[in-house]
Amino acid sequence: HGSFQERIFTLVGKRLWFLYQEMIAPIKKGPLNVLGQPLQPCCNKLKTGWYRNGSCETDENDHGRHVVCTVMTDKFLAFSKMAGNDLSTPMPQYQFPGLGEGDCWCLCASRWQEAFEAGMPPQVKLEYCEESALEIIDLENLQAFAVKAP
């Protein structure tokens, strides 16, 4: 139990410890893009990405790794549909309008790699691709299909 001074010191000491921990705790760094810069939203028009907030950020629950900011082409959409991932047909039950030529979308890294290997990858906006895409896709391959972000 201790004296009043001991109890006060214990309380103040604990508070100082917590303040110290807050001061030295590293500032949480937001997600980075494949260029090592802060990740920016891929699309404001469509609700894309794992979080459906327009950004290609991810977490450990995103098994598909929706981290590649792509610009749709009719060629890629046809390939994707043929491969079993129909991105062009609207699905109102999921609030999905369907994608068309020129739409941006956070694509699964493995799907982009599959399309790349088939010679059909969509273009990408490097500034908006989350860095973990590099665990699956070579940066040089992304750069070869990069378009300038607005």
Where are these regions (language model features)?
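Extended boundary segments
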Residues: 24-75, 146-148
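Short alpha-helix capping/helix-loop boundary micro-motifs
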Residues: 88-95
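Short, compositionally biased
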Residues: 112-135
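Short, basic/aromatic beta-hairpin or loop at an interaction surface
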Residues: 71-86
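Glycine- and charge-enriched low-complexity intrinsically disordered segments
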Residues: 131-150
